[in-house]
Amino acid sequence: AEVAETPEGGPAVNPAFNTFLSAAAADRRDAFLGASQRLGTPEQNIEKDLWVSWTLDALFNGAARGGPRLLFKGGTSLSKAFGLISRFSEDIDITIFRDDLGEAADVEDLEELSGTQRRKRLDAIKSAAQAHVNGPMRAQVQARLTEALEAAGLDPTAGRVEADPDDRDQQSLLIWYPKVTAADDGYIRPAVKIESGAKSALDP
């Protein structure tokens, strides 16, 4: 069978998300409410969990072919990929392969440098990661989000991707999604956070 592709040449995101998003808002609310009652958690958590899964799929399957590789890490990716733990989270942790940003450097290489040289290399890696996260990655996730909302017959401007203003390293994104569940106390915000960087070790 042929695999559907995005305009940039990468594989398309899972069409099941579009099927669900195409349902009437009331039906989606009922689905979130039913799941929340079964799992004993606020319906806003269920809604956010859907968008966490959507974001993981958009990063993994919706990226342009030939772009920098991503290492998915942390409890959110672990729970979604392998079901080893059960958790609700708003954060997705990823590491960008330094080699693919043109800043190849393993831990041993960095340890051999003097303090000044090491800081320069780490600053260069950080700058490359910032440029990728706030440039191509942000644009690609926004494109996938707009496509998903349009395909579902929803307002394509109802979702947006923006830089996280609270991240001093400027390597995190917030994916704001169109909320259909009831308003809560503001504790569960309708946004999924992508925390990224390129300094972390790629091996466990």
What are these regions (language model features)?
Residues E2-P204:
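Compositionally biased terminal segments of proteins
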